[in-house]
């Protein structure tokens, strides 16, 4: 029985390490991108197939969904440059983005509250269209009379100005009585027949969602018919925000995702875009492209005809791959008819930013699940809520991990205490077990009978030593995904040399401390009588120290605190058991 208990503990540890490594490659791996030809400047090229197919429209879209003729360095040049005059610059407290007036696509987004890397002051680039990468948010009106389906190409919108900031915003009072600064960027396109299309982007200070609205004023003599579309288009370039450290490469999930009322969260890998195409209709759905810590998503909104109140519309959600291997997640609205002399408004929300669960949950059902904690999400969710609670009090994620670990140990204390008490008794009877092995070692049946009698007499359960580890492993794994998936912990410092809890310890100090605590903890456990088992258990602290060298510092911190509390708990229990045994022996003496 004792041998089986030790193998169970050893097996649980190896299974945990194996699951972590397997998860890196299985759920979060992705196919390596095919090499792409790069040029100094991305010029417009024919991607007509990138437009979604309109319903009931006897037209062929000869237009393009163009790439901005601009590089990242040129975007950072002066506003008076020839390139920047083609684009509309919008700067809020959260975004610095550029809109191409041809088609009204967002061709670059910089997230001002998130740095490119820990040691960089450059903002994280969410969307871009340059020699390195194509990743844009597109929208427009397609169909029979949609300007984006015109044979002459996508519409060139007129703009009032080419640079907007929050200084151009207006104060708006919401229904809850709060005042917000709201910035609206209008783009106008007029047809010779008298149809006016106003495409507007609305930004609210402090909020990531962008409202993209198309208003059609039909002053012509004929009925106008079209559909709104919104899509995210991305090439197969690598994730700029992925983690890659040491001998292990953390391949975070990069791919499509979508949700509907009856299927809240679904992944769709880029490699499966051709074989598992998304094509479904939903009211209240969404489409997204997910990467490490960040997500971009289209959420279809409301349709308003003439003076009627806006109502949510049923949108077609779809995925496809273009002729030039661009991955597209998008939606199209139903066909909209605007009789002569009337108007309509149709909108959608675009989210392009960090995966903040509270904000995503308010936007659409299931969108917050892009923060993917895997199959242990119920435990991970509780751990994250606990971390948030402590962080709101002390303002440091490292100390929050320590306090959360203490709380978890207190909750598990009664169960673990019972297990450690049994292990302490095993430690006390170890000499007697060794004597029995020497006496009955050749007779396995007699040895097993004597051992069972000893366990029963001393009220010892050798398998109970597995309980603490079995309780800790799900928490350990869940906390790993919390550290890897929660953008709140990205670049979060603790103290001293630990300036990023989601990355490995740069000096390997915490893993070495963890190895010491594991060694001390082993010394408090009953030692194996089998020489081979003893050798394996002696090298386990070394093995786990090597594993932990490349794990997030926050996870190693959790394990150190957990081991330290366990050592104290086990030491006191061992002393108590030894004292009780001495008290039993003394009267009989």
Task: Enumerate the language-model features and the residues they cover.
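Membrane-protein biogenesis/insertion across secretory and organellar systems
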Residues: 1-410, 580, 584-589
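Core hydrophobic alpha-helical membrane-spanning segments
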Residues: 8-21, 476-479, 512-517, 539-543
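Membrane-interface amphipathic helices and adjacent TM-edge segments
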Residues: 214, 341, 411-477, 518-549, ...
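Alpha-helical membrane-interface segments at transmembrane helix boundaries
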Residues: 384-395, 455-459, 463, 502, ...
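Transmembrane helix interruption/hinge and helix-loop junction motifs
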Residues: 395-397, 547-556
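Conserved catalytic motifs of ABC-family nucleotide-binding domains
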Residues: 478-520
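Hydrophobic transmembrane alpha-helical segments of multi-pass transport and channel proteins
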Residues: 501-504, 508-512, 548-552, 564-568
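Hydrophobic core segments of alpha-helical transmembrane domains in multi-pass membrane proteins
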Residues: 514-515, 555-563
């Amino acid at each position: 029985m004792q041998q089986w208990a030790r193998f169970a503990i050893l097996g649980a540890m190896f299974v945990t390490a194996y699951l972590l490594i397997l998860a890196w490659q299985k759920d979060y791996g992705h196919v390596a991108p095919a090499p792409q030809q790069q040029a100094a400047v991305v010029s417009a090229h024919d991607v007509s197939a990138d437009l979604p197919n309109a319903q009931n429209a006897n037209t062929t879209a000869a237009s393009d969904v163009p790439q901005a003729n601009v590089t990242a360095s040129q975007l950072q040049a002066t506003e008076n440059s020839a390139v920047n005059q083609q684009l509309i610059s919008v700067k809020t407290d959260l975004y610095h983005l550029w809109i191409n007036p041809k088609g009204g696509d967002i061709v670059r987004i910089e997230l001002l509250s998130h740095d490119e890397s820990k040691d960089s002051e450059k903002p994280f680039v969410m969307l871009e269209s340059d020699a390195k990468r194509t990743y844009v948010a597109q929208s427009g009106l397609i169909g029979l009379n949609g300007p984006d389906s015109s044979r002459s190409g996508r519409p060139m919108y007129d703009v009032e100005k080419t640079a907007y900031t929050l200084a151009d915003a207006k104060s708006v009072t919401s229904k809850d009585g709060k005042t917000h600064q709201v910035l609206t960027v209008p783009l106008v396109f007029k047809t010779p027949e008298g149809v006016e299309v106003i495409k507007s982007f609305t930004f609210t200070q402090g909020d990531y969602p962008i409202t993209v609205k198309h208003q059609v004023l039909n002053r012509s003599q004929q009925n106008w018919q079209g559909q709104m579309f919104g899509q995210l288009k991305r090439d197969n370039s690598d994730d700029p925000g992925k983690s890659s450290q040491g001998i292990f490469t953390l391949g975070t999930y990069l791919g499509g995702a979508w949700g509907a009322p009856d299927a809240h969260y679904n992944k769709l890998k880029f490699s499966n875009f051709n074989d598992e195409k998304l094509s479904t209709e939903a009211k209240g759905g969404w489409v997204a492209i997910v990467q490490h810590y960040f997500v971009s998503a289209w959420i279809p909104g409301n349709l308003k005809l003439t003076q009627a109140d806006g109502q949510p519309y049923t949108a077609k959600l779809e995925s496809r791959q273009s002729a030039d291997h661009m991955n597209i997640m998008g939606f199209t609205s139903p066909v909209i008819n605007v009789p002569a002399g009337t108007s309509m408004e149709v909108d959608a929300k675009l989210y392009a930013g960090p995966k903040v669960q509270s904000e995503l949950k308010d936007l659409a059902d299931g969108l917050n699940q892009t923060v993917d904690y895997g199959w242990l999400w119920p435990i991970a969710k509780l751990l994250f809520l606990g971390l948030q609670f402590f962080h709101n009090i002390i303002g440091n994620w490292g100390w929050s991990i320590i306090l959360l670990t203490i709380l978890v140990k207190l909750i598990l204390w009664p169960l673990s205490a019972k297990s450690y008490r049994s292990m302490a008794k095993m430690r006390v009877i170890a000499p007697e077990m060794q004597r029995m092995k020497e006496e009955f070692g050749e007779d396995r049946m007699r040895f097993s009978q004597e051992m069972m009698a000893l366990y029963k007499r001393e009220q010892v359960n050798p398998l109970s030593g597995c309980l603490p580890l079995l309780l800790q492993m799900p928490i350990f794994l869940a906390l790993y995904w919390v550290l890897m998936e929660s953008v709140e912990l990205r670049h979060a410092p603790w103290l001293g040399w630990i300036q990023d809890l989601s990355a490995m310890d740069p000096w390997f100090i915490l893993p070495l401390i963890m190895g010491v605590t594991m060694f001390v903890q082993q010394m408090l456990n009953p030692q194996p009588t089998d020489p081979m088992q003893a050798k394996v258990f002696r090298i386990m602290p070394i093995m786990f120290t090597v594993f932990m060298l490349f794990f997030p510092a926050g996870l190693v911190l959790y394990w150190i605190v957990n081991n330290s509390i366990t050592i104290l708990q086990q030491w006191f229990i061992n002393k108590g058991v030894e004292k009780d045994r001495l008290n039993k022996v003394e009267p009989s003496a």
